[in-house]
Structure formats: structure tokens, C-alpha cells
């Protein structure tokens, strides 16, 4: 393979068995490789986000075949050229978990604190779980962070503690 090219491929549409197989088969038939992926069912919709690599010819094939496959399967499919991931040299990997009674604004409030300190959110997942005894909807946010090595962690922890205390949320922040 010559120089590697990269595409981010996203697909959203009604969930049904076989979608992952169909999409990964299309990528393989195009002569490309599926490197990184995130897939989930959100509501009744299947959502996919993948990093595909290959030579320029393969990337063109993924775009052409992907459009046809999306049409056939009723998926909104989008491709976008990108570059390979650069190693994060000046960042420390951390994980955060925030838990609280569900209400609008939790993701916004937490990520505003992180952005204000120059912290990059590398990945984020959230979900609702119901408390066993009360049945209360609990919101759980989990994220992988890239914290600038020059950032004073004590300041970040203090700000997160202040916000979480105001909102009655629990949080943990640890290396990883």
C-alpha cells in the first residue's frame, strides 16, 4: 500500500441486525481498513463513527460504495477526509466520572469547566441508570481526558468540586 489516507465515516439510521457486517464488508471490499470505531444504538437509531484507512483509490471506493450502501440500507452516511492521529505529547491521560440525578445541563456544565482549563475531551459516554430502590433516573457521564501537563491539577479539581457541590453531583477524576 502506498501513502495511507484516512476517512472518518459516519452512519445513522434505523437499527436492525446486520448493519455492522454490511458496513465492514463494504470497507473491506473497497480495499480499506477499519482502524477505530464507535457504534451504539441511541433510541431506535443505529449510530456508527469509524476511522478508515487505505490508499487514495481505496478511499474513493469507500466514498462511492458507502453512498450506494447508505441509500440501499436507509442510512445517512457521510465521509470526511482526515489525517492520522498525532501523539499527544504535552497531555496527561485522565478519566472522569460524574453521577447525579438526571436533568438538562450536566454535560454542558462539566465540559465548560474542562474547556475553560484547556482540557481536551478525547471520548465521552453518558447514559441513564435507575436507582435500584427509588427508581430515580441517575445520569452518568464518563470521559477520557487529555489534560495539559502544565495545568495545575489541584485547580481543576477545586473547580470541578465547586460545580459538583453546587449541583449535588458526585465525581471522580483519576489517571488513565
What are these regions (language model features)?
Residues 1-176:
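A conserved regulatory-domain signal marking ACT and ACT-like small-molecule sensing domains
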